[in-house]
């Protein structure tokens, strides 16, 4: 096997592009050089005349050093630009092309050297011993207008499975190759094929090498000696045709690469000849990429999407009764996130901190049995009455804990919900695990806990009312829980109604209208958001005598401007 390691010369197109870039750069660097010389001259004139220092009455020596640095910089830039201009003018990149290539590439006569036209006639050259200078040269290097010195070389790695014996190269003509190219049989190929010339035709139609399954020659013409110009239609006369041809060839090479199981095989390598294959040639490849049905999407996913769409449409219908601005509904997710964050930062986190502070004070006072989360609500209420002067915040904390007899679970769940900043552990229809056992209906849901602490917080912000001596002003007026029912016929009723406990579901009653938002994980938050939105838009931000805006509770900021 021949060893060939000859690196190809830069392509003609690359050198053409380089030459064009040099031509364009030569104009630009000349302009920049003149500009830099002008700037340096102006600064030098100012240095000798001291115009700026005299006009502005400033110290001359610091200014002189600054001007010297700028003049030096512009001078160096000018020298560099003139050096580049001189380089591109005196020693430009030159090309040796034929007149046809010059017209095709759009080159000027002054920058190229053209080869003289030749009178060509198709001749057949007798075989000669292999020339060492072209060992490893493939038939792909043939071109009617390419000299042997500029023909690309192909290493033997590109011809795996073949042993080409090139029979000679004519020294008398340009690009004239010997037709005596034979191939020796290798595994998988049981037929010797050789090129033969047809002296009567400039385009021989003899079968090329290796006419076997999986390898069909696109260009069946063997390399011949041309001594007459080819037809006009065989030349590309403009850049557009050249670009179209190159693009089509690149696409074909890309398709062959994708369809070839082994790029190193001579019958499947993306080279010059393996195009125009038949369907049978791709049989092995098509077996690897058999048509397969895609997996069906699961029905629950489709049902879930459909349910979400129906839920969204139902929510839009309910909100349309409150506001005509449908664009506000696009901000519902943002409002919900802000509201959850407000509950966490304003209620839950301070509540947990105060509970831990009170528990610490209880231990210091010698009352470890009154630890919050361990003692009953009744015991804590009695302690709040007895020790009110010592622990004034205990009575307010007890109001938040008056939800379930299981104080340990309630305190631990409030701590879990306060973590993460946005109640990430919130479960709308259940709660958390408690002491290794799953949540059950004997424990309050997270929705019930959040609703309770929200109502209790607003109880603490509203002024006392003589009608509600227990201090639950907001809860008594604006929250109704089943089995109790609100008086829908009363126009003054404005409340949140919990119509179901497990799973929890909330409705809004306002001016004899029932606003029933869709069931699900956001039902409680969206109901509370509608409650607050009505207060902002229809009640001027006032809940009774308390402002829920910036000067009061400061909760309406979640809706933006």
From Swiss-Prot:
Keywords: Cytoplasm, Glycoprotein, Golgi apparatus, Membrane, Nucleus, Phosphoprotein, Transmembrane, Transmembrane helix. It comes from Mus musculus (Mouse). It comes from the Eukaryota. This is Transmembrane protein 209. The modification Phosphoserine is found at residues 11, 98, 201, 248, 278. Nuclear envelope protein which in association with NUP205, may be involved in nuclear transport of various nuclear proteins in addition to MYC. It is a multi-pass membrane protein. GO terms for cellular component: Golgi apparatus; membrane; nuclear envelope. The chain crosses the membrane at residues 28-48, 60-80. It is found in: Membrane; Nucleus envelope; Golgi apparatus; Cytoplasm. Residues 138-152, 260-270 have a biased composition (Low complexity). Residues 120-156, 200-232, 250-270 are annotated as: Disordered. Interacts with NUP205. Glycans are attached at residues 57, 274.
């Amino acid at each position: 096997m021949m060893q060939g390691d000859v690196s190809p010369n830069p392509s003609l197109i690359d050198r053409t592009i380089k030459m064009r870039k040099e031509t364009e750069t030569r104009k630009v660097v000349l302009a920049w050089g003149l500009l830099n010389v002008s700037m340096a001259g102006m600064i030098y004139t100012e240095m000798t005349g001291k115009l700026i220092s005299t006009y502005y009455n400033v110290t001359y020596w610091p200014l002189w050093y600054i001007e010297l640095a700028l003049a030096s910089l512009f001078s160096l830039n000018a020298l560099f630009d003139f050096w580049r201009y001189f380089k591109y003018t005196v020693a430009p990149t030159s090309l040796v092309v034929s007149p046809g290539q010059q017209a095709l590439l759009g080159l000027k006569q002054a920058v190229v050297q053209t080869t003289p036209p030749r009178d060509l006639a198709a001749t057949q050259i007798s075989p000669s011993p292999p020339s060492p200078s072209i060992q490893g040269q493939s038939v792909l290097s043939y071109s009617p207008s390419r000299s042997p010195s500029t023909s690309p070389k192909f290493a033997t790695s590109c011809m795996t499975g073949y042993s080409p014996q090139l029979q000679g190269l004519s020294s008398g003509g340009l690009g004239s190759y010997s037709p005596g190219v034979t191939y020796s049989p290798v595994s998988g190929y049981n037929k010797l094929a050789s090129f033969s010339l047809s002296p009567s035709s400039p385009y021989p139609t003899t079968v090329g090498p290796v006419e076997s399954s999986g390898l069909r020659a696109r260009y069946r013409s063997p390399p011949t000696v041309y001594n007459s110009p080819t037809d006009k239609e065989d030349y590309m006369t403009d850049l557009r045709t050249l670009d179209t041809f190159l693009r089509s060839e690149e696409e074909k090479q890309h398709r062959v690469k994708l369809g070839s199981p082994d790029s190193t095989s001579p019958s499947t390598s993306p080279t010059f000849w393996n195009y125009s294959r038949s369907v049978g040639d791709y049989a092995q490849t098509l077996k690897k990429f058999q048509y397969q049905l895609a997996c069906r999407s699961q029905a629950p996913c489709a049902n879930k999407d459909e349910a979400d769409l129906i839920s969204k449409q139902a929510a839009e219908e309910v909100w349309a009764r409150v506001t005509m601005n449908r664009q506000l509904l696009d901000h519902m997710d943002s409002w919900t996130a802000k509201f959850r964050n407000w509950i966490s930062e304003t209620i839950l986190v301070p509540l947990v901190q105060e509970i831990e502070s009170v528990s610490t004070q209880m231990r210091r006072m010698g009352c470890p049995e009154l630890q919050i989360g361990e003692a009953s609500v009744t015991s804590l209420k009695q302690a709040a009455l007895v020790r009110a002067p010592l622990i004034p915040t205990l009575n307010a904390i007890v109001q938040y804990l008056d939800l379930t007899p299981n104080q340990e679970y309630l305190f631990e769940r409030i701590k879990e919900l306060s973590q993460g900043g946005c109640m990430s552990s919130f479960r709308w229809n259940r709660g958390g695990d408690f002491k290794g056992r799953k949540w059950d209906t004997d424990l309050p849901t997270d929705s019930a806990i959040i609703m309770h602490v929200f109502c209790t917080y607003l109880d603490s912000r509203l002024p006392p009312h003589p009608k509600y001596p227990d201090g639950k002003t907001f809860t008594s007026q604006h929250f109704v829980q089943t089995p109790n029912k609100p008086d829908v016929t009363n126009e003054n009723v404005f409340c949140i109604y919990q119509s179901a406990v497990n799973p929890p579901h909330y409705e809004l009653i306002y001016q004899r209208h029932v606003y029933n938002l869709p069931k699900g994980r956001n039902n409680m938050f969206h109901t509370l958001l509608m409650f607050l939105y009505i207060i902002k838009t229809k009640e001027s931000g006032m809940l009774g005598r308390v402002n829920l805006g910036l000067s009061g509770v400061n909760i309406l900021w979640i809706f933006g401007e």
